[in-house]
Amino acid sequence: MSNADAPSRKFSSSIIGIDLGTTNSCVSVIKDGKPVIIENQEGERTTPSVVSILKDEVVVGTQARNRILMHPRNTIFASKRLIGRKFGDPEVEKYVKGLPFDTMSHCNGDVWIRVDGKKYSPAQIGAFVLSKLKSSAEAFLSHPVARSVITVPAYFNDSQRQATKDAGRIAGLDVVRVINEPTAAALAYGLDKSARGNIAVYDLGGGTFDISILEVEDGVFHVKATNGDTFLGGEDLDNEVVKFIVEDFKQKEGIDLSNDVDALGRIKEGAEKIKKELSVSCTSKMEIPYICNSQGGPKHLCREITRSEFEQIAKKIVERTIAPCKRALADAGLDSSDIKHVILVGGMTRMPYVRRVVKEIFGIEPSTDINPDEAVANGAALQGGVLMGEIDDVLLLDVAPLSLGIELLGGVFSRVIRRNTTIPFKETQVFSTSEDNQTEVDIKVYQGERSMVADNKYLGQIKLKSIPPLPRGVPRIEVTFESDANGIYRVTAQDSITKEPQSLEIIPSSGLTEAEVERMVEESERLRHLDEMKRRKAELIVSSSELLRRPPTELERIPKNYLDRLGKVVKGEDFDLKEMEEVLLSAKKSMS
């Protein structure tokens, strides 16, 4: 669908739906009650989630992905795997060792990215991708876009969800709703198919895995349970293929490529190609000329991989999805035989091996009716339509993916909200002091399933002051957990004896401060202004060149000084943009 057709169409919703993916991202909008995928400026329906930063130039998408080999340290990919995470997380520490670009620990312990000495948060990198999607939508709709629904993996914790909202804000978007990716896919599938009964959404994307079990009935999409792994996806398979090729080359040639950044980048590019080809073919070949030099001269890499070999490489990754599926079924109180439909989401689900495993888990053939790369964005757009009141009789009831609670004496985790509790929710429990005459307490909030807080995710703390000095166990401290429809939490506390409003100091454990977000918003706006100037300059040069190629009889009507000045523009000489835009406009009027 061409963007050139956009002005003639009536679009019912100005809330765009965005799937901010690890590997690719996608944007959709509602037209006449149905979602429409918006192509980017390059005519692509999905945009690679890759950002290349060279000095002040920020390039996003395919053009950025093409720079990975030439500028590996300046080109950021799969930043979604780092968003809202700590640098010291074992998974993060292991993952960043294989990245060609630099990462670092921010002052609050979050993982950040460093390019040419400048520091960027993963949310800021995500914002660059969102800005491109926003621009694509504005070009398509022919009007500014300010509001969006953005999807996140169902198993994202509070920090990751908040960081995703920050990314939207930095990009100039009001994120009116954050919804889970599997729920969005189910919405896209269910509304289109008028599905009823229990649905499983198996979402294996570039960086994360989610499984959600939903009950769909008369437009109500009720998530019964969700499970997953926020560090499992196509990136891991690509890395396993790279290891396989590097080891194979070492055995054949006696040369170890594991520390050769350029070679690894080229092999990874080949791994991505093989992964796609083996989804439709039985064999694929990786051919990389001049992979390295040796004493005997340049070496070339050539290795054919069969689908059987590839599936053996993928086995341990794909099998890691089985246990979460079984846990989700158990949490939902269902057997696999109770599932009526299985929806596949994410590029990895194109693999025949993945589809076989899914069939073994649920005992039925998974549906291939929806595009696994576009379903999530379409579902987000549909949710935007619901919020706008353009789509009726639809209700989403999602759940909290992980338990929430506080730390008790001895580091014990006390659950207040159990996982798979329907959101939004509000729940209060009463606690007390652990010492005599204690006048203040630190209420530390955690998210997870382990019995000790040290094994769970620390979200932050509330300092409750002015508690009456009483014997331990006497004060009644009411701790209330609330969730909004985005799955983002708020925790409050008060002393029930005095019933006086308490001053709460919430100290976040991670994420961007308000000042950091404001600075990034300003930086994003500055870069958008620079991009706009570059676009206008390029358009001026093209338009001037086209005008100067008009027939001499037409050019005679244009003042000579206009033609001379436009000629200098085409030659690349310096010029004042606004002034020359006016000259071009005057020149065109002279011809009419």
UniProtKB/Swiss-Prot annotation:
Its main location: nucleus. Transmembrane segments: none annotated. It is found in: Nucleus. Pfam families: HSP70. The keyword Protease does not apply. GO terms for cellular component: nucleus. One of its GO terms (molecular function) is ATP binding. Keywords: ATP-binding, Chaperone, Nucleotide-binding, Nucleus. InterPro entries: ATPase_NBD (IPR043129), Heat_shock_70_CS (IPR018181), HSP70_peptide-bd_sf (IPR029047), Hsp_70_fam (IPR013126). Belongs to the heat shock protein 70 family. May act as a chaperone. This is Mitochondrial-type heat shock protein 70. It comes from Encephalitozoon cuniculi (strain GB-M1).
